[in-house]
Amino acid sequence: RESSPTSREHAYLVAETFGVALEEVDITPMVEGYAALTPDLTPHRKGNVMARARMIVLFDKSEAYRALPLGTGNKTERLFGYFTWHGDDTPPVNPLGDLYKTQVWRLAEHLGVPEEVVRKPPTADLIPGQTDEADLGLRYLRADVILEHYLKGYSDQYILGLGFTEEELRRVKERVNRTHWKRALPTVALLSSTAIGEFYLRPLDYRP
């Protein structure tokens, strides 16, 4: 109910363009049922509830169809922690996870995604009028360049010398550093020498 009608139209447009089967599931009763029990629910928290409700449906449908659920988060969102924990970034396979937002745009253009979809302002569409760049206080076109240089170990002075401001650099570094927990497995209290993910490690799951 909170989503823009345009998002629904674009979903059907993309499905039609690529010949993809589409099934629409209304999560409004799920979300509003919880909201009715939680009178202090803020728009931000409700947005997280909606994202997690989508995942309930996605994983149930994947089991029903014996299919693999795919994630949609891109590298910029993941580095910024700009996603709902146990929401959009939950699926076991994420084809876009190592592509910055600007790279996703170029890939979309290359694949023939309709221009009105590629050019629309990025938004989670969980709160009316919300946009990614307003939330982040930074344009993706600038954020991605800073992120790439920061991850490769370039100095602050070098990055600032590319024409970015100290405030832009601070925002990027702060978001990356304070959201590391969202990109990691749950923290486990180590009580044995066989703790999973710490001492018990598999080099690679592989099928001959």
PLM segments and residue spans:
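Conserved active-site and cofactor/substrate-binding residues in soluble primary-metabolism enzymes
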Residues: T6-H10, P29, H44, A53-I56, ...
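Short secondary-structure transition/capping segments
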Residues: R8, A35-L37, Y82-F83, P128-D132, ...
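Catalytic subdomain that performs nucleotidyl-dependent activation
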Residues: E16, K46-R54, A67-E148
